Amino acid sequence: MARNLDPKCRQCRREGEKLFLKGEKCFTDKCAIERRNYAPGQHGQKSGRLSDYGVQLREKQKLRRIYGVLERQFRNGYELAERQRGVTGENLLQLLECRLDTVSYRMGFGASRSEARQIVRHNGILVNGRRINIPSYQVKPGDVIEVAEKAKNHLRIKASVEAAEQRHFPEWLEVDTKAMKGTFKNKPERSDLPSSINESLVIELYSK
């Protein structure tokens, strides 16, 4: 299966902001953005002015990297969002937030989205009591997400849940940290998601 093998800290520096790709490290002063807040490479500190197309492309790449999806998956998500009722950009963000790997990450079952994705692929997550090993599976309001019994004793998962609890869970999730189980109450509203994401630039890029 195709994967993005670029170093995660390098991806954050390329976008000029924290994408939270490396779990707990991103919340410490060891984060690469804290130490070298400029683009990687020989000319990283001499960033030139981007064209309108360049700005749109950078925003798309940033969004793809945040959610860890490849171009084909992202394009398919845009096309689905465009067919749905409502605002296309908000629909796209909701589709990304409803992915099983993202929901598992938000519930603290993985320190990062990539770690949560790996746990899903290894049959470590149940949805309504059924094993689902497809990271892109779309979680629906009312679905119950739970760490599989065999994975509940993994120290990394325990540590991730504890750290997520300290940072507080999103309003659209209800999580029982002791049972390692949570309910996806509803899809997040646009106001619930980071304002640093400008999804309208992505829609402008794809609609050309």
Swiss-Prot record:
In terms of InterPro entries, this protein maps to:
Ribosomal_uS4, Ribosomal_uS4_bac-type, Ribosomal_uS4_N, S4_RNA-bd, S4_RNA-bd_sf
Any GO BP: ribosomal small subunit biogenesis
Enumerate the SMART domains for this protein: Ribosomal_S4, S4
SUPFAM superfamilies recorded for this chain? Alpha-L RNA-binding motif
Q: Does the keyword Transmembrane apply?
A: no
Residue ranges of the S4 RNA-binding domain? 98-158
Transmembrane stretches in the record are none
**CC terms in the record's Gene Ontology section:** small ribosomal subunit
Record carries keyword Ribonucleoprotein:
yes
Keyword tags: Ribonucleoprotein, Ribosomal protein, RNA-binding, rRNA-binding
| Domain of life the protein comes from | Bacteria
Task: Give the matching CDD domains.
Answer: S4 (cd00165)
One GO molecular-function annotation for this sequence? rRNA binding
HAMAP family recorded for this chain?
Ribosomal_uS4_B (MF_01306_B)
Assembly and partners are described as: Part of the 30S ribosomal subunit. Contacts protein S5. The interaction surface between S4 and S5 is involved in control of translational fidelity.
Q: What does this protein do?
A: One of the primary rRNA binding proteins, it binds directly to 16S rRNA where it nucleates assembly of the body of the 30S subunit.
Q: Which NCBIfam families match?
A: PRK05327.1, rpsD_bact
- Report the family membership: Belongs to the universal ribosomal protein uS4 family.
Q: This protein is called what?
A: Small ribosomal subunit protein uS4
The species this protein belongs to is Nitrosospira multiformis (strain ATCC 25196 / NCIMB 11849 / C 71)
